[in-house]
A protein has these predicted regions:
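A sequence-composition feature that detects small, non-aromatic residues
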Residues: 55, 66, 70, 74, ...
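N-terminal alpha-helical scaffold/docking segments in eukaryotic complex subunits
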Residues: 1-116, 282-334
């Protein structure tokens, strides 16, 4: 059994080994071995944000200012508009709220508008990135049974995808060191997340695996990221999906398959890794004893759904070798 810091070191070493060309075919199995060293933890009290109403009023204040600027067609550089750092901290904390009016239509909508309309300074964007990829955000209560920390984890990743998009298409505010840290943290998060809930009654969306798809799609679009790093990220997503024992019922598998098949069409290296992984999944089914627990059956059906989503993508959207293999093995549960 190991602690989170040790797992992070093992994943960092794996990433370097993939870069060096020392690991490829065994990447999934090595990740699996590392993940299995992390013991599940008992449920503990989740710390939730306070001051939701006050944060909402601050969001409304800034949104009103931004709307007035837009109506007057003012040039941003000529207007004294600035979100106070203290308010930004207050608002981003609401991403962890179980209440959608503070989290989803509140903090997420607000941050999305601020990022897309270039209303945060580069310093604030860098701070926001560091905040969202911190252990306290991405790994909060992640080894425990289902809990309210899922909102903190999932919406941190969702906003990260917006920051990565902005960094790629507008001003590159992230340093190489920060980008590397983002890749390390997101990869480990994708491998560790086990909460597959989509829409949760009055609390609204959690949707972690769709958000994983979004942020990973942005990582795959990084123009200067070497192929070995993209293989590592791909491996982490597939390793995490392999371990998932909860159903994904709100389109998450479709989104993941869309992102994975798209990158796999970009270079044969990614297609080879995807095909290798699918063959290992199929081999596990043939060689292992039949599932006996609900967890084992759910893992089996999750992988089956993954196969079927590849077929639904269509032959033109999937590498030929991958599509042909999945077509032959489409009776995955037989």
């Amino acid at each position: 059994m190991i602690e989170l810091d040790e797992l992070k070191k093992e994943f960092t070493t794996l990433r370097q080994n993939v870069r060096n060309g020392d690991v490829f075919q065994s990447l999934g199995e090595l990740m699996k071995e590392s993940l299995h060293k992390m013991p599940p933890q008992s449920l503990t009290t989740v710390s939730l944000p306070v001051d939701g109403e006050f944060a909402l009023k601050r969001m409304q204040h800034y949104t009103q200012q931004a709307d007035q600027m837009a109506e007057s067609e003012a040039v941003i550089e000529n207007v004294d508009f600035q979100v106070k750092d203290s308010d930004l901290t207050l608002i981003v904390e609401q991403l962890a709220s179980p209440l959608p009016k503070y989290r989803d239509t509140g903090a997420f909508f607000f941050l999305s508008d601020m990022i897309q309309n270039d209303l945060l300074s580069e310093e604030q964007l860098r701070w926001l990135t560091d905040y969202l990829v911190s252990d306290e955000q991405l790994f909060a209560h992640i080894l425990e049974p289902q809990n309210d920390a899922i909102y903190r984890r999932s919406f941190s990743v969702l906003v990260l995808s917006l920051l990565l998009f902005s960094n790629r298409t507008k001003t590159a505010f992230m340093s190489e060191t920060q980008l590397n840290h983002v890749i390390d943290q997101v990869s480990l998060y994708a491998a560790l997340e086990r909460d597959g809930r989509g829409f949760i009654n009055e609390n609204g969306w959690a949707h972690a695996f769709t958000h994983i798809g979004n942020v990973v799609a942005e990582i795959f679009l990084m123009p200067d990221l070497v192929r070995s790093d993209k293989v590592f990220v791909l491996g982490a997503v597939l390793a995490g999906f392999h371990e998932l024992s909860q159903p994904l019922t709100f389109g998450e598998t479709e989104r993941l398959v869309e992102v994975i098949t798209h990158i796999s069409k970009q270079h044969e290296l990614y297609a080879d890794y995807l095909l290798l992984t699918l063959k290992i999944w199929r081999k596990d089914l043939v060689t292992q004893t039949p599932p006996k627990t609900q967890q084992q059956w759910q893992q089996l059906y999750n992988r089956s759904q993954f196969f079927h989503e590849i077929l639904l993508r269509g032959k033109n959207e999937v590498p030929e070798a991958v599509f042909d293999y999945v077509s032959v093995t489409k009776n995955y549960l037989a």
